[in-house]
Amino acid sequence: MLATAVGSLQELVTEYCWGAIWGRPGLDLKTRSLLNLAMLTALSRPHELRLHVRGALNNGCTREEIRETLLQAAVYCGIPAALDAFRNAADELGD
């Protein structure tokens, strides 16, 4: 039963997040990636942040842009959340 629920949730994520939202006009993938990094920092979601750091690189973001996004988030989300985000991003980037 739980496996079915998880599968259904993943289908929803794939359809809604990756299809409906990421496929919309108005923002390029690079900008969407940087927004997600800032939001995941604010929400303190380290696992998802690491996944989105990889995605950001694949979507054309530079390491400097990722760093600057996390610094920007630090001011508005708080230093503890930003420190966690920097640690996870550094691990993912191999820094």
Predicted feature residues:
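Acidic, glycine/proline-rich low-complexity segments that act as flexible tails and inter-domain linkers
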Residues: M1-K30, N58, A82-D95
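Amphipathic alpha-helical interface surfaces
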Residues: L9, T31, E48-H52
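Short alpha-helical scaffolding segments that buttress acidic/His motifs in well-ordered protein cores
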Residues: V13-C17, L34-T41, T69-A74
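Amphipathic alpha-helical segments within well-ordered protein domains
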Residues: G19-W22, N36, V53-L57, R67-L71, ...
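Alpha-helical scaffolds flanking conserved acidic
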Residues: L29-L34, E64-E68
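Mid-chain, well-packed structural core segment of small domains
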Residues: A42-R67
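C-terminal structural segments of small proteins and small subunits
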Residues: L70-A85
